[in-house]
Amino acid sequence: MDINYKLYLITDRSFLNGRSLAECVEDAIKGGATLVQVREKNISTRDFYNIAREVQEVTTKYNVPLLINDRIDIALAINADGVHLGQSDMPIELARKILGDDKVIGISAGNVKEAIEAEKAGADYVGLGTVFFTGTKKDIDEPIGLAGLKEITEKITIPSVAIGGINKENAKSVLATGVDGISVISAILKNDDIQGASKTLANI
């Protein structure tokens, strides 16, 4: 599957202030988001499924790929385009057996070793970070920074996406490290003008 990783939106309903997630995703796509990941923690499988279906209606309308965070069962249930897995989630090889060769599998990596191992195991892309301190994850290790990002991108050949504290002020310097795109949550979803925020990032 040919994926444009340039502006990768990850969902977080805690930033929406009562707004519909599907509408916010649509605004982000209209602004230039090229890939969407539904990320939900601490909700029931039924609720996750329903949310993913609502978002999928939007991504399908605009022909934007949809990935599911962690939950391979949800990805299978809605026939999503793939999954994004963390270091403590199911091994890539098993995920590939379950999902098949035509689905996208992304892996989080925080250093060169993890990124190289992900590529060897068959990951389609790696999410690199955390790049900067972020308000989204409270229990992260020390950020890898721009130097860490550049070091990793020079050691792998699969696409890479930077994540963690990325916004319109630092996105240009992040992209200059050689990553294929940026992953954002609050830089888009915290804005009253989601489409405008997305457009600003897409044009960097």
UniProtKB/Swiss-Prot annotation:
Q: Which reaction does it catalyse?
A: 2-[(2R,5Z)-2-carboxy-4-methylthiazol-5(2H)-ylidene]ethyl phosphate + 4-amino-2-methyl-5-(diphosphooxymethyl)pyrimidine + 2 H(+) = thiamine phosphate + CO2 + diphosphate; 2-(2-carboxy-4-methylthiazol-5-yl)ethyl phosphate + 4-amino-2-methyl-5-(diphosphooxymethyl)pyrimidine + 2 H(+) = thiamine phosphate + CO2 + diphosphate; 4-methyl-5-(2-phosphooxyethyl)-thiazole + 4-amino-2-methyl-5-(diphosphooxymethyl)pyrimidine + H(+) = thiamine phosphate + diphosphate
**Cofactor mode of binding and number, as noted:** Binds 1 Mg(2+) ion per subunit.
Where does the sequence pass through the membrane? none
Q: Which InterPro entries match?
A: Aldolase_TIM, ThiamineP_synth_sf, ThiamineP_synth_TenI, TMP_synthase
| Pfam families xrefs | TMP-TENI
**Residues binding 4-amino-2-methyl-5-(diphosphooxymethyl)pyrimidine, per UniProt:** 37-41, 69, 108, 137
Q: Identify the metabolic or biological route this protein is part of.
A: Cofactor biosynthesis; thiamine diphosphate biosynthesis; thiamine phosphate from 4-amino-2-methyl-5-diphosphomethylpyrimidine and 4-methyl-5-(2-phosphoethyl)-thiazole: step 1/1
For this chain, the family text in UniProt reads:
Belongs to the thiamine-phosphate synthase family.
Protein's recorded name: Thiamine-phosphate synthase
Give the species: Clostridium novyi (strain NT)
In the UniProt record, what gene is named as encoding this protein? Answer: thiE
